[in-house]
């Protein structure tokens, strides 16, 4: 799948779920035990804002609009524009984990956003059967990249959790990245 299309589909999945989150749910727990729903949303919006800050020629994001959905959409649009710009896929991004080309970074962002869309769905009682084609692709990418060095306390991912093969691909992705699928 085209990386820009995949990125947009992950952002769209998150936005669709976010539109159904009620204010009284924001303090609730998520599959990421250290985060509330509001923290999870902030992580995704903030991650999108960081794309410009980590670019070879750093770009500060515009002021956040009011409202969670508007803030996400604005930050996602700017991140997408940076990747889609001429040279965006070959540009070097300076992440905390090191320098990576745009082609790699967009895949990391896509997986992060889709996985946190799953977290948001699970936390708010929405369907976790998210974009099966995209989830299959991101699961394959995660299997290639996420080894034992990235799992455990103080690391980005918990150990892989069991997930029946008949479950939707997004559930399988979530379980591979350490979420308990119910």
Swiss-Prot record:
Residues 151-172 are annotated as: Disordered. GO terms for molecular function: metal ion binding. It comes from the Bacteria. It holds the Pfam family MDMPI_N. Residues 157-169 have a biased composition (Basic and acidic residues). Transmembrane segments: none annotated. InterPro entries: CHP03086, DinB/YfiT-like, Maleyloyr_isom, MDMPI_metal-binding. Coiled coil: none annotated. This is Uncharacterized protein MT0763.
């Amino acid at each position: 799948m085209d990386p820009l299309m995949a990125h947009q589909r992950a952002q769209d999945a998150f936005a669709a779920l976010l539109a159904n989150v009620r204010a009284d749910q924001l303090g609730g727990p998520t599959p990421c035990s250290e985060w509330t729903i509001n923290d999870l949303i902030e992580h995704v919006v903030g991650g999108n804002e960081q794309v410009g800050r980590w670019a070879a020629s750093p770009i500060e994001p515009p002021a956040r609009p009011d409202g969670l959905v508007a803030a996400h959409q604005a930050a996602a649009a700017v991140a997408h524009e940076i990747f889609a710009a001429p040279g965006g896929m070959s540009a070097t991004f300076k992440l905390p984990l090191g320098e990576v080309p745009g082609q790699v970074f967009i895949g990391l962002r896509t997986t992060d956003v889709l996985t946190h869309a799953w977290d948001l769905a699970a936390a708010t009682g929405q369907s976790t059967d998210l974009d099966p084609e995209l989830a299959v692709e991101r699961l394959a990418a995660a299997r290639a990249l996420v080894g034992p060095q990235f799992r455990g306390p103080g690391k980005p991912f918990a150990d892989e959790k069991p997930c029946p093969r008949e479950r939707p691909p997004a559930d399988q992705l979530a379980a591979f990245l350490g979420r308990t699928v119910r």
